[in-house]
Amino acid sequence: MPDAFVCASDYVACILMQLLEKRGLRVPEDVAVSGFDNNIEDLLAENLTTVQVFNEELGSRLALQILYRIKYPHTPHEVTYLESKVLYRASTGD
């Protein structure tokens, strides 16, 4: 069993935490779990360490890139970095 899981979404992380609990494992005592997207719709998610992505900024940047790519289809691809924030909560311990 790994020491930690980093999940692609908070939804997946919450399901994983439920499955771990059914197998008798404790989060974070036995295994740490982290999500991604800070989508708190589940009661388990309020204790979930996650990475918050600023969706408005992401959407704006994506729209600009699509429009640019339509206008200039042969330009090289670029790497875009966007701000995010780790929200440390109980699922990864102290």
Which ranges hold each PLM region?
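Flexible loop/turn connectors
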Residues: 1-94
